[in-house]
């Protein structure tokens, strides 16, 4: 080989060839990725501008390189033969290698003509990578839950003033709604609230950190948003489930949040709140309950954007067992008013429903809210919750709302109830006149359906706009009566205990218990319809001591005493014995609250 050939086309070592080859591949891949991203519309204007500048730079470098090579050949051509005779070929080769190494490998950039066209397979991979990058960038817009971990003096004051107990004390309360680390699309909906309620402030940090929670708080404390905000936020970060439908049911794995409630009214109310909140991120909630046909509910479940289900245990289990409700991908489970559901005998249904969902090891987060913390609720929590944080607002014993003024009237004759009822209606409306802008709402409770019908007739005859809510009414009639009461078309509503718990009716100023309920728990929940969301209220209770009332007198007085209410002297004639709940196997127990000495055991010889 001549010296000219050696100079014109020097041989490169294997390492240098490999390095140049890798550099070219890297540049080509980088350029192709940027171009593909720009074509797909994923790249920003800055990336597109960078691609244009890079192309311009590549063309300029190519021209400079060619010009430099031409100049170098012209300069070296006269001395080629001399250099070949004076120096051995190996040294010349080495010298040329050294010259070529002066140009860094990293400057070897491919031109547009050198870039090979991407194959279909490469284009597919590139599109997939671009989509993943876009998803990552959109997910980055959702702030990760970063809740405070250190208790400050302000946190401790908040817990003490609201009588809150955290077991264990892992997460300080979140005192400002604006500090919520949630999807930015959800924040405007919450900005209309001034500050979180105590149960919300303590629940949100733990639930946003994906911990299981047991919340014990009075009715009307904002529990729906306490579990709803973290649940909807979690679903907004999960990808929607895609797939083919099974018959007339929904796409398998489509339902990701399930809320169980004890009554149709409470389920409907929670559904309305979650629907309004979920709309901000395109999530739809469906409410399922008995008393109406299943076909309409099954059609709603099959809609593409349905990812939240709120239902009563009976209908939920029915649809799950029939295969029309797939719960295999539920990642957020809520048991609302758990003690009420257990009291109503839904424990077996709840256990069977939970069996349709994934376990906590598969990532299911479980939330339980209750007004009390009895043994039955503790047992259920220990079975289905994973190391839960327990939040107690107030006492875990049965207690009434201290913001509600309690008035107890002991009546010798039950027939006096109608007269006293109309008296309190007239007195309350005189102080709080009804108007369209500020409607006055009065809730009257009866024990039985027939009594509710009679009271509705009595109140209407007295000249008041009144509606009713009881079990003999159709579901449509119940919805209409409830809506008329909420909007102020009817300012008096007569109800049985079917509406005593969980209903969020705004601004109920007065509750009248015409007949005392069968349990003190129901009494507390009846009264809880007023004095909600931090407001004050008033409850009037007629007590005759007949039938079941006498056995509940002791517990009733204990509840009144705990909230500092005045107990009429006429109550002294009733026994102070507190009857404990009846156990299925061991019957009822009694606790004597008097200071009388305990009986002495007598032994016979």
UniProtKB/Swiss-Prot annotation:
Q: What is its main location?
A: nucleus
Q: Which residues bind ATP?
A: 217-224
From the Swiss-Prot or TrEMBL record, state where the protein is found. Nucleus, Nucleolus
- Cite the Helicase ATP-binding domain residue spans from the record: 204-391
User: Taking every annotated instance into account, which residue ranges of this chain make up the domain Helicase C-terminal?
Assistant: 424-575
- A GO-annotated cellular component: preribosome, large subunit precursor
> Which superkingdom heads the taxonomic lineage of this protein's source?
Eukaryota
One GO BP on record is: endonucleolytic cleavage in ITS1 upstream of 5.8S rRNA from tricistronic rRNA transcript (SSU-rRNA, 5.8S rRNA, LSU-rRNA)
**Basic residues: which segments have biased composition?**
54-66
What's its job? ATP-dependent RNA helicase required for 60S ribosomal subunit synthesis. Involved in efficient pre-rRNA processing, predominantly at site A3, which is necessary for the normal formation of 25S and 5.8S rRNAs.
What's the protein here called? ATP-dependent RNA helicase DBP3
Source organism per UniProt: Cryptococcus neoformans var. neoformans serotype D (strain JEC21 / ATCC MYA-565)
The organism's lineage is: Eukaryota, Fungi, Dikarya, Basidiomycota, Agaricomycotina
Q: Which gene encodes it?
A: DBP3
């Amino acid at each position: 080989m001549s010296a000219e050939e050696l100079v014109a086309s020097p041989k490169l070592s294997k390492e240098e060839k490999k390095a140049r080859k890798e550099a070219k591949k890297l540049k080509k891949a980088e350029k192709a990725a940027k171009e593909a991203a720009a074509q797909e519309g994923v790249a920003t204007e800055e990336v597109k501008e960078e691609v244009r500048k890079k192309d311009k730079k590549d063309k300029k470098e190519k021209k400079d390189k060619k010009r430099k090579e031409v100049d170098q050949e012209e300069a070296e051509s006269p001395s080629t033969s001399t250099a070949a005779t004076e120096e051995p070929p190996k040294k010349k080769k080495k010298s040329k290698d050294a010259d070529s190494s002066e140009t860094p490998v990293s400057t070897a950039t491919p031109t547009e003509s050198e870039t090979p066209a991407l194959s279909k397979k490469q284009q597919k991979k590139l599109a997939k990578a671009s989509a993943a990058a876009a998803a990552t960038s959109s997910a980055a817009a959702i702030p990760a839950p970063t809740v405070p971990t250190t208790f400050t003096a302000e946190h401790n004051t908040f817990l003490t003033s609201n009588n809150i107990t955290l077991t264990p004390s892992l997460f300080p309360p979140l005192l400002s709604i604006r500090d919520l680390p949630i999807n930015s699309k959800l924040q405007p909906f919450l900005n209309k609230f001034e500050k979180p309620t105590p149960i919300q402030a303590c629940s949100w940090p733990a639930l946003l950190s994906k911990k299981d929670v047991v919340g014990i708080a009075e009715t009307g404390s904002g529990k729906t948003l306490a579990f709803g905000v973290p649940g909807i936020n979690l679903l907004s970060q999960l990808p929607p489930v895609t797939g083919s439908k099974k018959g007339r049911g929904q796409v398998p794995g489509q339902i990701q949040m399930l809320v169980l409630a004890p009554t149709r009214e409470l389920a409907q109310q929670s559904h309305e709140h979650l629907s309004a909140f979920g709309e901000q991120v395109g999530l739809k909630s469906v409410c399922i309950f008995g008393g109406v046909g299943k076909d309409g509910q099954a059609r709603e479940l099959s809609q593409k954007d349905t990812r939240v289900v709120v239902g009563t245990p009976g209908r939920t289990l029915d649809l799950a067992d029939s295969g029309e409700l797939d719960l295999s991908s539920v990642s957020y489970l809520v048991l609302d008013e758990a003690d009420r559901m257990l009291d109503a005998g839904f424990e077996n249904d709840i256990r069977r429903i939970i069996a349709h969902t994934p376990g906590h090891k598969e990532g299911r987060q479980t939330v339980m809210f209750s007004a009390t913390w009895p043994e039955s609720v503790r047992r259920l929590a220990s079975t289905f919750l994973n190391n839960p944080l327990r939040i107690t607002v107030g006492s875990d014993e049965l207690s009434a709302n201290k913001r509600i003024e309690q008035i107890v009237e002991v009546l010798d004759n039950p027939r006096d109830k109608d007269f006293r009822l109309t008296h309190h209606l007239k007195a309350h409306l005189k102080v709080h006149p009804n108007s369209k802008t500020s409607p006055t709402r009065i809730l009257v409770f009866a024990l039985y359906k027939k009594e509710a019908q009679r009271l509705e007739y009595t109140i209407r005859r007295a000249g008041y706009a009144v509606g009713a809510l009881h079990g003999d009414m159709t579901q449509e009639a119940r919805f209409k009566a409830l809506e008329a009461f909420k909007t102020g078309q009817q300012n008096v509503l007569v109800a049985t205990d079917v509406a005593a718990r969980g209903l969020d009716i705004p601004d109920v100023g007065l509750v009248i218990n015409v007949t005392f309920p069968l349990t003190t728990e129901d009494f507390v929940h009846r009264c809880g319809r007023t004095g909600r969301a931090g407001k004050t209220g008033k409850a009037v209770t007629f007590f005759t001591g007949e039938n079941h009332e006498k056995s509940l007198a002791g517990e009733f007085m204990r509840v009144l005493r705990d909230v500092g209410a005045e107990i009429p002297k006429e109550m002294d004639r009733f026994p102070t014995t507190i009857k404990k709940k009846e156990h299925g196997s061991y019957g009822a127990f009694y606790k004597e609250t008097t200071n009388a000495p305990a009986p002495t055991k007598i032994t016979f010889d």
